[in-house]
Amino acid sequence: MTEAQVKNAVEKFEALIRAQSDRSDKIKAQGDFIDFKSLDKIIIGVCGGDGIGPVITKESARVLEYLLDDKVKAGKIEFKVIAGLTIENRVKANKAIPDDVLEELKSCHVILKGPTTTPQAGDPWPNIESANVAMRKALDLFANLRPVKVPEQGIDWTFFRENTEGAYAVGSMGVNVTDDLALDFVVTTSEGCDRIARLAYDYARRNNKGRVSIITKANVIKTTDGKFLNLCKKVGEEYPDIVTDEWYIDITTAKLIDEKRRRDFKVFILPNLYGDIITDEAAEFQGGVGTAGSANIGKRYAMFEAIHGSAPRMVREGRAQYADPCSMLRASVMLLSHIGEQEKADLLERALDICMYEDKKLKITGREDGCTCSEFGDYVMETVRKISE
């Protein structure tokens, strides 16, 4: 290794440290969460993304428009279509989110977002950052909330994944020091840990969840994971009515499939990378990632999405119209709840449970032997009408 190589790596590391320090200062200066009741109009952005994204997002927006028809007609809610968050536009701009698209996103209060394609090794695309990661950072969507519920198995879990720090914070900014040595970085701040922990404990208290589990690998990754664990535990001390326990990520993945132990879990707090992995595992219990929605919450903005990818193969094979919208519809339930429409959120959630697990009049297979995305949307709205009568 040459002195020039060391100097180059140090300069890049210094730039990363300064940028993350500035971000930490901005977190300290933030105000409180937005009060949707005080708004004259709530603007819901509808951003289709890539692959099957436009299909399932359009269908979910159609269901939302049906449920919110009275508020739309009264001028209290507006749907705004944002069409530019595609891999082609992002590559053309050489940015994870083109500037004009980001401005459109910032003009909304909440965003319903379809899956986007993230370039990886071997793809024809340049190495631009994940649009999801970029959006979470740009809009400071610090909490990723993913519920998993399977009543017959005693599963009622809610995952709070820290969204803007950890191993993903500077995921495209690692340093190739030499041909033989590459380094990536993990970011943990006091402010980031404190706010995700408070959100999780507040949720646990409001929803009568008696246990919060903090998931790390602090026995090995002692500095960043250790900081995350200690600060979350410190917040937990302010909630004596809630039991706090701590688990290592590896044993947690095992205990989720332990039929006796998994019933004890209620609310989880996890750093970014662990949360991404374990929530996909958890989603399998209720039918896979195609059935699971996700909320990304910040103090000013919120974004709601499916947790699966853009499925480009379905598009190439001409099967996009058969894509499963359930993940986006589950995300829509959380969107409704977030903007204060809890009654309509409960109504949509009940309709989805009937369509997916009870009545099951239509079956989604992703192919011609199943129903189309649009047909399933009609089925959900028909079910909403029936249970509203």
Please describe what each predicted stretch is:
Residues 88-183, 273-275:
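N-terminal glycine-rich phosphate/adenylate-binding segment common to multiple enzyme folds
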Residues 65, 69, 107-110, 137-144, ...:
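Generic secondary-structure signature for well-ordered alpha-helical cores
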Residues 15-16, 88, 257-359:
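Glycine-rich phosphate/nucleotide-binding loop
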Residues 16, 20-23, 28-30, 170-173, ...:
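Glycine-rich phosphate/pyrophosphate-binding loop and the adjoining helix
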Residues 73-98, 254-256:
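N-terminal beta-loop-helix "entrance" segment that forms/cooperates
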Residues 45-61, 67, 177-251, 264:
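Glycine-rich phosphate/diphosphate-binding loop of Rossmann-like nucleotide-binding domains
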Residues 6-79:
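N-terminal phosphate-binding or glycine-rich loops at protein starts, especially the Walker A/P-loop
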Residues 50-53, 109, 160, 200, ...:
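Buried hydrophobic positions in well-ordered alpha/beta secondary-structure cores of metabolic enzymes
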